[in-house]
Amino acid sequence: MNNSKTKKLVMASLLAALCCVATMIIKIPSPLKGYLNLGDCVVLLSGWLLSPAYGFAVAGVGSALADIFSGYVTYAPATFVIKGLMALIAYYGFKILGNKIGNLPSRIISGIVAEIVMVLGYFVFEGFLYGFIPSIVNIPANAVQGVAGIIIGTILIKVFEKSKIMME
């Protein structure tokens, strides 16, 4: 492995661990056995900082491990897919829009689209588990988590850019 591949693998591993920890540190139970957390900011960061494959893996693995370690094993497979898709959306949204409207607006827009996918993804997943009518109660909580993820992720990416850490 060359230095560049090693660096990418180390960055991805660190971000996956950070995603897991950020998801587990502050857990606010939601009405239907899930929980609110701060992991979405790392999910978005992984999409904005890494390649699509690494971003998907970081977001999916880090978030799913947090579910497993926290006793939400039933959620882990859905979390892997939903959070991985969020990172892909953040990546491609940023890449497509970045040159057209600038970095900050493209990150905000890609973050909003990614978080909408998260809210809808968990609504559908919980709809199959608990019924679609009861699953509606988690939509506002997931939306709040999404807004927090966008705000914190946008702040952190600016810090990373200024310090030149974790940039490919």
Positions of predicted regions on the chain:
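Loop-helix junctions at membrane interfaces
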Residues: 1-168
